[in-house]
Amino acid sequence: MPVQHVKLARDRRKKRAYIKVGVFFVAILLILTGILLTIKSKPEENSIFSTFDSGEYHELNTSPNENSTALQPDENATSYDDELQAKDDEVDEVKLSSDDLDTLPQHAQDALNGLLDAADQAIRITDQFSYTVTEGDTLKDVLVLSGLDDSSVQPLIALDPELAHLKAGQQFYWILDKNDNLEYLNWLVSEKEERIYERLEDGKFKRQVIEKKSIWRKEVLKGEIQNSLNSSLREKGLDTRQISQLSNALQWQVSLRKLKKGTQFAILVSREYLGDKLTGQGNVEALRISSGGKNYYAVQAANGRYYNQQGETLGKGFARYPLQRQARVSSPFNPNRRHPVTGRIRPHKGVDFSVSQGTPVIAPADGTVEKVAYQAGGAGRYVMLRHGREYQTVYMHLSKSLVKAGQTVKKGERIALSGNTGISTGPHLHYEFHINGRAVNPLTVKLPGTSSGMTSAERKQFLVRVREAERMLKP
């Protein structure tokens, strides 16, 4: 925070302190006036009024008689004003006692005590400051704005070591006394917590931690896909991590890239509230997408990961071979293989299975047909499948393709017949396995499977969550 901003905050608080002092003195005057009126309203305590009431005074007889004597001026008196002045000098100073204040009603005494405390604090305070922490700030950086040094910082950090690890966005409010010593520090740690440090008479500080209680509420957010599922989920407040996890759980059930505009979805979230205000903390418990007349779910388990309704990650998982039965490997995966036709060193990015022409080729896992094409100078007729976002499989030298681009396939479904097209030494199937675009050995790669890693008890708890998600996200 710029120094100018701190100065403005200090001046603004000074004005409020002056207003408090003014209110205090006005209240004192009003109370004193009320006390004086109360005293005067008691006739029995005033000798003048009691004399009139007793009848001791009679009607003045103004007729002269022989026993009366005329008033003679006093030769020693200097003036009438002197006599008045003498009388004034004899009057005692009027003082309010605690007994007079005790006669006030209780609510008036409470109000007076409150005003006295406020005025005392306002008089003692000379400077007030505020600051919002930025990245890399330390407590010393904060307090130096008001002229304090390490001698004020170290006792606070010794009392609360967490003051040595400030986070951007946290706020501080602090007060200096008339001697420019730190008297009060308020640290807004988060929306749910604040810590107060007050200086005692011995110079040490005491700490008070105030925690606000929050509540978590489950809510359903509904929407329709506009540009893409990811952007639509982001508009609903989901962060990048949550979107990625949900996409990973759904990608094996439905082709996310082919979801059309207007596709409906519903999200089950739990959110934290302070009163009626969101704290920004929340969790996505489940997601439903309705496409092609079917509902697809991603439900969070106790381990924080998302699975389909059966607790599976990849539906039926991957098979090791793209054939109905195991076949002989005629050429293994080899990044430095010499091509048998061209004679040049050329990486062999897959495995060749020696099979007769027309042998059925099957999908090793659920997926989508990404490409069907023909390359005369190499792969011949080939098919490429995509399995989620990470995995691709490629099948070359085919005699016939049985699928079309964009088509969804299931594990074990026939996708082509083996052949001898392109540059080939004889009938065989060339099979490649790619992870994030990089070819790996199909026979040794660790295949992604269906196991969730959940125990029997965890799976039972997960299925309870599934039923709750289905009930709350029901279309």
Curated annotation (Swiss-Prot):
Q: Where in the cell is it found?
A: Cell membrane
Pfam families from the entry? Answer: Csd3_N2, LysM_OapA, Peptidase_M23
Q: Where is this region: Disordered?
A: 55-79, 330-350
| Transmembrane spans | 19-39
The way this protein sits in the membrane is described as: Single-pass membrane protein
Record has Ligase as a keyword: no
User: What's the protein name?
Assistant: Uncharacterized metalloprotease HI_0409
Source species? Haemophilus influenzae (strain ATCC 51907 / DSM 11121 / KW20 / Rd)
Native organism taxonomy: Bacteria, Pseudomonadati, Pseudomonadota, Gammaproteobacteria, Pasteurellales
